[in-house]
Amino acid sequence: MKAIGFKSSFQLDEGNCFEEFNFDIPHPSGHELLVKVQSISVNPVDTKQRTMPVDKVPRVLGFDAVGVIEKIGDQVSMFQEGDVVFYSGSPNQNGSNEEYQLIEEYLVAKAPTNLKSEQAASLPLTGLTAYETLFDVFGISKEPSENKGKSLLIINGAGGVGSIATQIAKFYGLKVITTASREDTIKWSVNMGADVVLNHKKDLSQQFKDNHIEGVDYIFCTFDTDMYYEMMVNLVKPRGHIATIVAFNSQQDLNLLKSKSVTFTHEFMFSRPLHHTDDVIKHHEYLKDITEKVEQGYYQPTTTKVIDGLDVDSLYEAHQILESHSMIGKLVINLK
């Protein structure tokens, strides 16, 4: 089988260092599924991991995938051969930038039947990140009526995570405020369901006042935590909660959180599979809920760009686009 990877970390300005490798098709055992990959999504985490030291050569990146189960391990109980599934994988194994992939069943769910593979591939990583942030971190209710009156600010509402998080939060009853700046990103965020879209290039505090927003219960930062840290502390309500998926690049003063008793959390969606937590089955459960909501028409996919064919050039192009920070929604590569 073909896989696209690299032997050592590299920056894009060093040239295209992706290479094509050929491996034997693996055999599933235990709770493993052998999936023939149809479509993958490229995420910012891929571009970050490309620049990190390589422990095992070659390094094959990729998390989001949609594909067909070709074989199952002898302990698999939730799936059968021929099922079309989607997932976001685990940092503990080779990624989805390959024709066949082994994946454990508790990280997988059946893909929405009303979506093409290139549409469904946009949902797992960002959807899981949003579900974990909203339900596990913020602790919102799964009963929409119980979230009435609660508000959420999403920094970078038109990105992949912000796009699906907006839809999920709206379905579960939150008032959603997002940030964007370009005409196309503002329109996109509104289409995703945002109640208010603020211009991140202007003073957010003043825009809160202009829109009669006294503060928000939750803030979900999906872009440059350092840039927004003090502003988020100012905008969150007392005893509110801030979560980020972007690591700090410099030291920040946690004492700023004290006077409001604000909770600050780093959300890392891969913590469960990385550390084999007892509740790792939540990935399956959350993905299953995403599938149900998509099939019922409540969520829509966030794919905005599709590249046909997985090879060294298409993957390099995808990484270039991601690093330009101009993407709205998600970028997908079809293997078919």
Swiss-Prot record:
InterPro entries in alphabetical order: ADH-like_C, ADH-like_N, ADH_Zn_typ-1, GroES-like_sf, NAD(P)-bd_dom_sf, PKS_ER, Quin_OxRdtase/zeta-crystal_CS, YIM1/Zinc_Alcohol_DH_Fams
Keyword Oxidoreductase in record: yes
SUPFAM superfamilies: GroES-like, NAD(P)-binding Rossmann-fold domains
CDD domains: AL_MDR
Domain of life of the organism encoding this protein: Bacteria
Pfam families recorded: ADH_N, ADH_zinc_N
Entry annotated with the keyword Zinc: yes
Entries under Gene3D superfamilies matching the protein: Medium-chain alcohol dehydrogenases, catalytic domain (3.90.180.10), NAD(P)-binding Rossmann-like Domain (3.40.50.720)
Signal sequence annotation: none
Keywords from the named record: Metal-binding, Oxidoreductase, Zinc
GO molecular function, one term: zinc ion binding
Family: Belongs to the zinc-containing alcohol dehydrogenase family. Quinone oxidoreductase subfamily.
Name the UniProt record assigns to this protein: Zinc-type alcohol dehydrogenase-like protein SE_1777
